[in-house]
């Protein structure tokens, strides 16, 4: 029997006997998931996973091996669950396991594929669209936490969000659907709350998956929208009245949603920037994701630590409308203040007042630099934040009371004006150059790395979801490209993530080759439907993305991205060729995709080879230039350092003082130029050759670390030579 890994253990609150009893009573649960002592555990692929609803798989790595290394209590819940699972496996015969679908046998296996046909599962809600002829428009538009978010398009061109759990968790989606049904029945639908239709079976890669379907909100998340709105205000595109009036409009809309939920006795528990989407067409904010909802007075299933109200800690008061009001205000504070620039500051900590020093520091040009979460004076805005986030739950206003606060009552603008400003922000002149404005953080790369390791573990147990891993890899290539451009992630982490991606491609190729010997086994053959769906939902989006990449002008900094894209195309070809050899006639559609992949690979190879040859040529030129500087570099560097350390600096003065200052500077410049006079022509010729090369090399990160070091050395030498060449023009 394979060992069982424990992740996310916790102090004991249940006996071994009760754990056995719990499993025996609930062995028919469809997911291998347990709820013990208010904590949820997920069991899949021979692992017992403590379900952490805030960060999903990124936190599952906590506690791995602690049980078996003796570092945790022998009587902890996780150990009890492990003993229970071992006992269950020993006491359940192989024959019985094979006869029990979705029961104990699935506690030790991979997520089974549903046998239900495509379409609605059960009765959808009133007004649900017809799913006959639906297709996958976008696979994994988002992949956050425990869910895949894909886009399904009906034959009438209506776009629906399909929320698919990464592991066996039908119960979670069903519970979320039931919450929406209860709200619709009790309080009615709300224009600023997600519009859900029901559970359905949808295509996903080469599988069929059960998903919660809802209307797509085409737009941006809260942080992106308000960041762009703030930029428009700073650039003078809108005035202060329009900016703050729009903020107040958003606050009123979100508080109207929390009031609506309260009428149904439901608490959201996870309102945050990522769960508020602004509709591009209407400008309206829409609250999404009731996955962590609870009834009023109950302990929440989970929360996001940096936004939650203080009363939601373990063992404290239950969730309420007032805790949702807290979430709305901490969300607004996060977006207004720009807390993403400093992840050490949490929005639920509120504003910090500073009176002993300026609330804003100045940059080198004398302009104020905003410090997130810092306030220097009291205003209606700061009082609003403090009156919500700085008081206990008993003293905190509910939704309607919060809407009457002076900050939200004064200085408002009419709704149509606010919505027009938001629509312009999302679609008009105020839009940023790219709609993908969310920065890639170190935490995001760690989460993606954990997801890749999960796929690698599945490959080791011969349970790899080929469509899922290739779709995730396509998403990760985009994320890594963006992280390299932004420069906000340590280069060692980027290098490690890049290595993990390339390793995953090698594992996929080995996995496919290892399965080739099984192609005569009918159980491993892929149906024409699944092959076609794989091409449409996995291959097609990758081809379109890479083709756009190929149409762009590239620099040396793009070599790493092109290498990864080339590997992605190679792997797609390997997988598709293998699928084409599994006994089924090769369709014209398959031939078409194979030809397109091959053509894209050839074009990409040509561009990559050209760039690599140009880079090798640049390296040779760089080496020659650095060697040329050897005759003057040390003397020039020392002369310039002496000039900088001895020249008089005058910030202000009369015309007479300014003239004296200029005479002194000219004297110092003459001395410095005399020291390097024999190298003047060499330095001038050096800069003529080095500046075009530096432009070609750029400033971005490059795969060749030695080349980066040499580039920066050339940049320093060019700066020295340029400054010395300018001294005569500037001062003499």
Swiss-Prot record:
Its EC number is 2.7.11.1. Gene3D superfamilies: Rac1-binding domain, C-terminal subdomain, Rac1-binding domain, N-terminal GTPase binding subdomain, Transferase(Phosphotransferase) domain 1. Acts as a virulence determinant. This is Protein kinase YpkA. The gene is ypkA. The active site is at 270 (proton acceptor). The keyword Aminoacyl-tRNA synthetase does not apply. One of its GO terms (molecular function) is protein serine/threonine kinase activity. PROSITE patterns: PROTEIN_KINASE_DOM (PS50011), PROTEIN_KINASE_ST (PS00108). Disulfide bonds: none annotated. Its main location: secreted. Transmembrane segments: none annotated. It catalyses: L-seryl-[protein] + ATP = O-phospho-L-seryl-[protein] + ADP + H(+); L-threonyl-[protein] + ATP = O-phospho-L-threonyl-[protein] + ADP + H(+). Keywords: ATP-binding, Kinase, Nucleotide-binding, Plasmid, Secreted, Serine/threonine-protein kinase, Signal, Transferase, Virulence. SUPFAM superfamilies: Protein kinase-like (PK-like). It comes from the Bacteria. ATP binds at residues 142-150, 163. GO terms for cellular component: cytoplasm; extracellular region. Belongs to the protein kinase superfamily. Ser/Thr protein kinase family.
């Amino acid at each position: 029997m394979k060992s069982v890994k424990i992740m996310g253990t916790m102090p004991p609150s249940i006996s071994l006997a009760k754990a056995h009893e719990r499993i025996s009573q609930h062995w028919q649960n469809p997911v291998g998931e347990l709820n013990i002592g208010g904590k949820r555990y997920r069991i899949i692929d021979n692992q017992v996973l403590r379900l952490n609803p805030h960060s999903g798989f990124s936190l599952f790595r906590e506690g791995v091996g602690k049980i078996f290394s003796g570092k945790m209590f022998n009587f902890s819940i996780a150990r009890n669950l492990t003993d229970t699972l071992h006992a269950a496996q020993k006491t359940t015969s192989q024959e019985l396991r094979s006869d029990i679908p979705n029961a104990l046998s699935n506690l030790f296996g991979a997520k089974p594929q549903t046998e239900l046909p495509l379409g609605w599962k059960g009765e959808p809600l009133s007004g649900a669209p017809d799913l006959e002829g639906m297709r996958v428009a976008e696979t994994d538009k988002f992949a956050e936490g425990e869910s895949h978010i894909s886009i399904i398009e009906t034959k009438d061109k209506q776009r629906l969000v399909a929320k698919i759990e990464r592991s066996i968790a039908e119960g979670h989606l069903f519970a979320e659907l039931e919450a929406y049904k209860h709200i619709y029945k009790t309080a009615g639908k709300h224009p600023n709350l997600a519009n859900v239709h029901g559970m359905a079976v949808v295509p996903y890669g080469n599988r069929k998956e059960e998903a919660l379907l809802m209307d797509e909100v085409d737009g941006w998340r809260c942080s992106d929208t308000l960041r762009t709105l703030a930029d428009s205000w700073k650039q003078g595109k809108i005035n202060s009245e329009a900016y703050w009036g729009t903020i107040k409009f958003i606050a009123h809309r979100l508080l109207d949603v929390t009031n609506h939920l309260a009428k149904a006795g439901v608490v959201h528990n996870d309102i945050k920037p990522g769960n508020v989407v602004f509709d591009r067409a209407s400008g309206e904010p829409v609250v999404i994701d009731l996955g962590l909802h609870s009834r009023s007075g109950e302990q929440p299933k989970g929360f996001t630590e940096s936004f939650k109200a203080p009363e939601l800690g373990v063992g404290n008061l239950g969730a309420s409308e007032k805790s949702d009001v807290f979430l709305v205000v901490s969300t607004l504070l996060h977006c207004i203040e720009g807390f993403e620039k400093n992840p050490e500051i949490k929005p639920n900590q509120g504003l910090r007042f500073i009176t002993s020093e300026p609330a804003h520091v100045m940059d080198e040009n004398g302009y104020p630099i905003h410090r997130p979460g810092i306030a220097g004076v009291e205003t209606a805005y700061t009082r609003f934040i403090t009156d919500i986030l700085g008081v206990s739950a008993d003293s905190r206003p509910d939704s309607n009371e919060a809407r009457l606060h002076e900050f939200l009552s004064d200085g408002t603008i009419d709704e149509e004006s606010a919505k027009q400003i938001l629509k312009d922000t999302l679609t008009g002149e105020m839009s940023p150059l790219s709609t993908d404005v969310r920065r890639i953080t170190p935490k995001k790369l760690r989460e993606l790395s954990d997801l890749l390791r999960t796929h690698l573990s599945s490959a080791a147990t011969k349970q790899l979801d080929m469509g899922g891993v290739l779709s995730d890899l396509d998403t990760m290539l985009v994320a890594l490209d963006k992280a390299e451009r932004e420069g906000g992630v340590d280069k060692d982490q980027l290098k490690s993530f890049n290595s993990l991606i390339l390793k995953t491609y090698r594992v996929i190729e080995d996995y496919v080759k290892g399965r080739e010997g099984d192609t005569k086994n009918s159980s491993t053959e892929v149906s024409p439907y699944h092959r076609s769906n794989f091409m449409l939902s996995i291959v097609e989006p990758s081809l379109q993305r890479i083709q756009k990449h190929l149409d762009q002008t590239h620099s040396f900094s793009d070599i790493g991205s092109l290498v990864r894209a080339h590997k992605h195309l190679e792997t797609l070809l390997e997988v598709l060729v293998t699928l084409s050899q599994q006994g089924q006639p090769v369709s014209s559609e398959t031939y078409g995709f194979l030809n397109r992949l091959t053509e894209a690979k050839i074009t990409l190879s040509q561009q990559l080879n050209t760039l690599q040859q140009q880079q090798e040529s640049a390296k040779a030129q760089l080496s020659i230039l650095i060697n040329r500087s050897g005759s003057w570099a040390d003397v020039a560097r020392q002369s310039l350092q002496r000039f900088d350390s001895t020249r008089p600096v005058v910030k202000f003065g009369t015309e007479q003082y300014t003239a004296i200052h200029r005479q002194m500077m000219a004297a110092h410049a003459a001395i410095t130029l005399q020291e390097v006079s024999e190298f003047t022509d060499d330095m001038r010729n050096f800069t003529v050759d080095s500046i075009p090369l530096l432009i070609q090399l750029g400033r971005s990160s490059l795969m060749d670390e030695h080349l980066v070091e040499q580039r920066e050395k050339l940049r320093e030498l060019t700066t020295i030579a340029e400054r010395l060449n300018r001294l005569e023009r500037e001062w003499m």
